[in-house]
Amino acid sequence: MKQKILIRIAMTDDTTRAKAMKTAVQFKGVNAVEIKGDHRNQIEVTGVEVDMIALINTLRKKVAFAELVSVAKVEPPKDGDKKPEEEKKPEEKKPEEKKPEEKKPEPCCQPWQKPEPCYQPWPHDGYGVPSSYPYPCDPYNQIGEPVYNQDPNCRIM
């Protein structure tokens, strides 16, 4: 159920208004926030199933004193409320312009996956467990030692 909630907040400057709007927008279920009122001291919150009590308590903690002014249910427009001008106009068929299909670019790299460590098999001769069992043979799939450039182009003098 979509609803409009009007809340009066003790806002005196623009920074307080911005903080109140930011706090209200971050709340769960809120779709839109507007500043209303003659003194710009009210905000109108539009959303779906917004917990207004928790919203007011959060505004009181983070911004300033807040009180609930009104709550109104927003009904979607009905099909019978269409403008008569739209019904009188004959439907004109426009030639459809074909848009070229947009292809998504393929990623240049594969997503990172955690490598599976390999372990030595369990000794089956029954003489105990090695002290380092199980140990990964190559946990990061690195082959050999890293190679450092011995002759860099940039020299520090």
Curated annotation (Swiss-Prot):
Residues 73-115 are annotated as: Disordered. Disulfide bonds: none annotated. The keyword Iron does not apply. The modification Cysteine methyl ester is found at C154. It comes from the Eukaryota. InterPro entries: HIPP47/16 (IPR042885), HMA_dom (IPR006121). A lipid is attached at C154 (S-farnesyl cysteine). Keywords: Lipoprotein, Metal-binding, Methylation, Prenylation. One of its GO terms (molecular function) is metal ion binding. Residues 2-71 form the HMA domain. Residues 155-157 form a propeptide. The keyword Metal-binding applies. Residues 75-106 have a biased composition (Basic and acidic residues). Probable heavy-metal-binding protein. Belongs to the HIPP family. This is Heavy metal-associated isoprenylated plant protein 16. The gene is HIPP16.
